[in-house]
Amino acid sequence: MVTEFIFLGLSDSQELQTFLFMLFFVFYGGIVFGNLLIVITVVSDSHLHSPMYFLLANLSLIDLSLSSVTAPKMITDFFSQRKVISFKGCLVQIFLLHFFGGSEMVILIAMGFDRYIAICKPLHYTTIMCGNACVGIMAVAWGIGFLHSVSQLAFAVHLPFCGPNEVDSFYCDLPRVIKLACTDTYRLDIMVIANSGVLTVCSFVLLIISYTIILMTIQHCPLDKSSKALSTLTAHITVVLLFFGPCVFIYAWPFPIKSLDKFLAVFYSVITPLLNPIIYTLRNKDMKTAIRRLRKWDAHSSVKF
């Protein structure tokens, strides 16, 4: 009976592991700083108390949480001889990954819907995207994330693990773990693709259709409004591609390639949460202005103190 799993990690080279430790330590620091900066800015600046920025702040919290499930252990494991995780710890990682990942999908869809209403039906925006609607969206996001993660965990919790325990990655995820089970997992592989893969692909297609409709609507707007809307949409579409691109290949692609899987796993858990705050702050004038106001307020408070 397997009681622990051994991660093979990203590399066997000690020199490369030292470099990767420094690189990902800086990256994770950037993830924490960037996403917390967005949350603090949105909460503290009344100019950003709108549905779009409410959803953005929640997206930043989920990005930070999603990265924190895997990145800290990956970083500490670079200096470990045996990169080990307990069986229960592995199940917890699977649960949290799909909990935050499922919730993020819903929030990205909600952000697409928010932009659709704001641009295509502006007169109804305040009625549809009211405070209660935003709270309801978050409740649905967490609820779907929970149901999705429980369904994923149900696939793995009763599987017999009696022999191989080496996971060729730096964290536990269902497609990799079920391959170590002492039973035929073909049907289970199909169920995982049907669950995570179909959910990912359908969500991605829905978002692409929504943003296509929005882009077609923008063409008929005045130049000043269309340029601002296009800037915001570019940020949204970039984030959607960064999130769903790796997900489609990890969960929906039936012919996994080990080296590509590791790269996509790093991209999904580290690079995307790092880039999202940069994209939203660099492409959004309101966010940049609010951050400057926050810095001035902080400097003023320090001088006063």
Curated annotation (Swiss-Prot):
Its main location: membrane. It is found in: Cell membrane. The chain crosses the membrane at residues 19-42, 51-72, 94-113, 133-151, 189-212, 229-251, 263-282. Keywords: Cell membrane, Disulfide bond, G-protein coupled receptor, Membrane, Olfaction, Receptor, Sensory transduction, Transducer, Transmembrane, Transmembrane helix. GO terms for molecular function: G protein-coupled receptor activity; olfactory receptor activity. InterPro entries: GPCR_Rhodpsn, GPCR_Rhodpsn_7TM, Olfact_rcpt, Olfactory_Receptors. Residues 1-18, 73-93, 152-188, 252-262 are extracellular. GO terms for cellular component: plasma membrane. Disulfide bonds join C90-C182. It comes from the Eukaryota. SUPFAM superfamilies: Family A G protein-coupled receptor-like (SSF81321). Odorant receptor. Belongs to the G-protein coupled receptor 1 family. This is Olfactory receptor 4F4. It comes from Homo sapiens. The lineage of its organism: Eukaryota, Metazoa, Chordata, Craniata, Vertebrata. The gene is OR4F4.
